Amino acid sequence: MVYEATPFDPITVKPSDKRRVAYFYDADVGNYAYGAGHPMKPHRIRMAHSLIMNYGLYKKMEIYRAKPATKQEMCQFHTDEYIDFLSRVTPDNLEMFKRESVKFNVGDDCPVFDGLYEYCSISGGGSMEGAARLNRGKCDVAVNYAGGLHHAKKSEASGFCYLNDIVLGIIELLRYHPRVLYIDIDVHHGDGVEEAFYTTDRVMTCSFHKYGEFFPGTGELRDIGVGAGKNYAVNVPLRDGIDDATYRSVFEPVIKKIMEWYQPSAVVLQCGGDSLSGDRLGCFNLSMEGHANCVNYVKSFGIPMMVVGGGGYTMRNVARTWCFETGLLNNVVLDKDLPYNEYYEYYGPDYKLSVRPSNMFNVNTPEYLDKVMTNIFANLENTKYAPSVQLNHTPRDAEDLGDVEEDSAEAKDTKGGSQYARDLHVEHDNEFY
């Protein structure tokens, strides 16, 4: 039997859905490498950025280089001992830290590489500063593709993740927002984020992932939270080969119900690209449009939103998809013909902004999905009334998260004005040039 993926409707945007987007990117992020043969390649963030710039999306949004997260900021979630270890360990002195390496699970999947701590601080800084800008009403959507490292634990690296930037970003959002919703569309379960907020009703976590003999082995249907957090963790365990139409038929009703009943005042969306068809480590069959539909759907609720990266191990497909999704966040449906960019040869032989589904068999039967949905909605019945939060004095903003002054930005160049000032200029929709 040959399985044919159902064609997906073209994605559309409404003029009324225009949002102010703050995009965080650090040019150094692509310089870091986990090591030869390791599937995680930070270079994909640089490839996505190159596409985003060459499509002209820089005219539509403000671009920032976030301050790297400090030790003090990282320790809002992680233990001092663990962060201290990350800041001191290098490939040269690894022998001295043998005991700690075992304790903190740093080794095979999470190797020590040159610049490890700096890489973590870039990832954490983007998510924390994005959250701070949302808190102050400076933007409606914050984007940090260097973030999304959802497996990292309080004092342990896991699944290519060392610093859990998502948890740090959510902690920042909780200073202003009574309820935060976290949605995860990575093929792997968002275990680190779920674990961090498993006992609270102030954060609802919702993860759509492959379950069954697959890393990290958590995220089954009956994991719903404990104590005050009971029913505030939602897990949607899926099987191999899920296609666009099937994914949409699960994603949209679940998110709609959560939005209706939980009424979050901010949402964090982890856009792991390993749920795309043809991923080196994934086993789903989503096209670029199927993945992007999730972003567009969450955006349509008009709630302050932070978008972070995550997994994704076929670099050309991750870059294409994140670029297309950045367009949607800016209310633009990008043209399929790729503009010339410095990584153009990666996108052959078609050179199109497209990730097509394969003829992979969809193991997710309607009966299985009905059972999953019935279970989830039964649990959500218990969250019908959004939990309230006691009024508290909001602590002063961290000085490190203040706006960058132009004086401290990069030196002025030949065109007059600084690059920083031009990055903040957003072109009006009616401009002709």
From Swiss-Prot:
Function according to Swiss-Prot or TrEMBL: Catalytic component of the RPD3 histone deacetylase (HDAC) complexes RPD3C(L) and RPD3C(S) responsible for the deacetylation of lysine residues on the N-terminal part of the core histones (H2A, H2B, H3 and H4). Histone deacetylation plays an important role in transcriptional regulation, cell cycle progression, DNA damage response, osmotic stress response and developmental events. Is involved in rDNA and telomere silencing and in double strand breaks repair.
Biased composition (Basic and acidic residues): 422-433
Domain characteristics, as noted in the entry: The ESA1-RPD3 (ER) motif is common to ESA1 and RPD3 and is required for ESA1 histone acetyl-transferase (HAT) activity and RPD3 histone deacetylase (HDAC) activity.
Signal in keyword set: no
Organism from which the protein derives: Saccharomyces cerevisiae (strain ATCC 204508 / S288c)
Lineage: Eukaryota, Fungi, Dikarya, Ascomycota, Saccharomycotina
Gene knockout outcome: Heterochromatin spreading downstream of the silent mating-type locus HMR.
Gene Ontology process terms (BP): cellular response to heat; cellular response to nitrogen starvation; G1/S transition of mitotic cell cycle; G2/M transition of mitotic cell cycle; heterochromatin formation; meiotic cell cycle; negative regulation of rDNA heterochromatin formation; negative regulation of reciprocal meiotic recombination
Record region (Histone deacetylase): 19-331
Known partners and oligomeric status: Component of the RPD3C(L) complex composed of at least ASH1, CTI6, DEP1, PHO23, RPD3, RXT2, RXT3, SAP30, SDS3, SIN3, UME1 and UME6. Component of the RPD3C(S) complex composed of at least EAF3, RCO1, RPD3, SIN3, and UME1. Interacts with cyclophilins CPR1, CPR6 and CPR7, with the kinase HOG1, and with ESS1, CYC8 and HAC1.
Catalysed reactions listed for this entry: N(6)-acetyl-L-lysyl-[histone] + H2O = L-lysyl-[histone] + acetate
Residues recorded as bearing Phosphothreonine in the entry: 394
General remark: Present with 3850 molecules/cell in log phase SD medium.
Residues recorded as bearing Phosphoserine in the entry: 408
EC numbers: 3.5.1.98
GO molecular-function terms, A-Z: histone deacetylase activity; histone deacetylase activity, hydrolytic mechanism; transcription coactivator activity; transcription corepressor activity
SS bond list: none
Tagged with keyword Cytoplasm: yes
Protein name: Histone deacetylase RPD3
